[in-house]
């Protein structure tokens, strides 16, 4: 791979990562397809994906930095009253706990058995079905904003997040759907999903980077930098656009799109 082509690949995959990481469409499925079409696969590609994923994480931090600082008691501007319930670090810990416990136990097994195109294809379909169920059967909204989310709801979202251990299911799709099925508004569920992503993805990406540290070299720095910066910028735009859209649109189009991507995976890799 020439240096110019490597930078082109980094730019394209950075766009794909930034667009799909926080939408309920599965970034894994898209990265598998686009990586295959670009001829960029294997251990180095997997390490590159982890690095540019960190760019997407940084975008969430940039969008929700006030909320993230608030979780650790640092407030900018007017501090909320003491008797006013707000999103806290406890909510995030409860949301993380199930996936952390299960993920640590089966991380190696997932890497060895669930990263194939066929299993990702099934996950795309299953995640699409869950989105439809969440839209069609969600109960009356009891938690309209982030600060209305209860500890029980946060833990329930954490249980749904375990579904995203199945590559292709979509972490945001699982957590947003779970939140909606527990009476959280679409907007609040999406915002909680994004904030919850920061510690979860930092932990998962950090573990993957540590395990693949031997594959990192200064020669790859330009490619990794282009992918990282592109993913950061595109993810910033995608997050803000997505949060604006879901105020007036439901998730059915995303479910249909997932089925289309699953069919594309079938045609390219399975048929």
Curated annotation (Swiss-Prot):
The chain crosses the membrane at residues 5-25, 45-65, 86-106, 114-134, 149-169, 189-209, 226-246, 251-271. It is a multi-pass membrane protein. GO terms for cellular component: plasma membrane. It comes from the Bacteria. It is found in: Cell inner membrane. GO terms for biological process: cell wall organization; peptidoglycan biosynthetic process; regulation of cell shape; response to antibiotic. GO terms for molecular function: undecaprenyl-diphosphatase activity. Keywords: Antibiotic resistance, Cell inner membrane, Cell membrane, Cell shape, Cell wall biogenesis/degradation, Hydrolase, Membrane, Peptidoglycan synthesis, Transmembrane, Transmembrane helix. Its main location: membrane. It catalyses: di-trans,octa-cis-undecaprenyl diphosphate + H2O = di-trans,octa-cis-undecaprenyl phosphate + phosphate + H(+). Its EC number is 3.6.1.27. The keyword Ubl conjugation does not apply. Bacitracin is thought to be involved in the inhibition of peptidoglycan synthesis by sequestering undecaprenyl diphosphate, thereby reducing the pool of lipid carrier available. Catalyzes the dephosphorylation of undecaprenyl diphosphate (UPP). Confers resistance to bacitracin. Belongs to the UppP family. HAMAP family: Undec_diphosphatase. This is Undecaprenyl-diphosphatase. It comes from Aeromonas salmonicida (strain A449).
